[in-house]
UniProtKB/Swiss-Prot annotation:
Disruption phenotype: No visible phenotype under normal growth conditions, but mutant plants show increased tolerance to freezing. This is Transcription factor MYBC1. Probable transcription factor that acts as a negative regulator of freezing tolerance via a CBF-independent pathway. Repression of MYBC1/MTF1 promotes Arabidopsis plant transformation by Agrobacterium tumefaciens. Expressed in roots, leaves, stems, petioles, filaments, stigma, pedicels, sepals, anthers, petals, and siliques. Pfam families: Myb_DNA-binding. GO terms for cellular component: nucleus. Residues 102-161 bind DNA. Induction: Induced by drought, salt and abscisic acid (ABA). Down-regulated by cold. The gene is MYBC1. PANTHER family: HOMEODOMAIN-LIKE SUPERFAMILY PROTEIN-RELATED, TRANSCRIPTION FACTOR MYBC1. InterPro entries: Homeodomain-like_sf (IPR009057), LUX/BOA-like (IPR044841), Myb_dom (IPR017930), Myb_dom_plants (IPR006447), SANT/Myb (IPR001005). Coiled coil: none annotated. GO terms for molecular function: DNA binding; DNA-binding transcription factor activity.
Amino acid sequence: MREDNPNWFLRWEEELPSPEELIPISQTLITPHLALAFQIGSPNHHLGSKRTTAIYHQKLQSSTTPTTPTPTPPPMMMNSDFGGGDSTDLGSGSIGGEPARTLKRPRLVWTPQLHKRFVDAVGHLGIKNAVPKTIMQLMSVEGLTRENVASHLQKYRLYLRRMQGGNGNGITGGHVIVSDSATDRLFASSPVPAHFLSPDYLMPPLEHSYMGKHVITQQNQVVRNLRYEDSEYGHGSMKMLKLFPAGN
């Protein structure tokens, strides 16, 4: 048919509508009443174009700008304080990549009952030659350490020296002895054996190695004798005092 009419393209072009008859692309095909009924707002092409451009520039800027890592706050130190006082650190070091945490053991509180047990043990050994290890064995208190006994023994010897001097504070051997009211009240809760105040009993321990071994041998014999007596009258088992009893 196109071969029969060579001017078909010109006729088709003449039949096309003029630009004035064409509907602009920006014009909506929905009537205002219909758009209001369906709550359809008229699109704002300029506003959408501006938003798209702003988002594009924001993403481009974030990709080119180096990001600085957010500093993490240092981890807090976990301090477990049992007993409400000074305690001993058990160790340090990093565990699992975390910084060292201060671990503390329960603080020992010397009660009048515990001090009386200490005085009884020192009475068997003698205040002059009593050593912390043997005192700890005689006391037979679970949770009591050698350091606890050594510190208490030193304070008790100073207390006896103050009592021998007849004053609360004094000077012995060139050293000023300062009394502690709380410690003195604890020591006064148990009667002091009379022979503890003898000058011979307040002498320092023997420093000769042979004599020191001899004293330790005698103290070990005292421990064995006490255990034998306890087995005879206590049905074969020593009474163990628990310093930190477990909960029910």
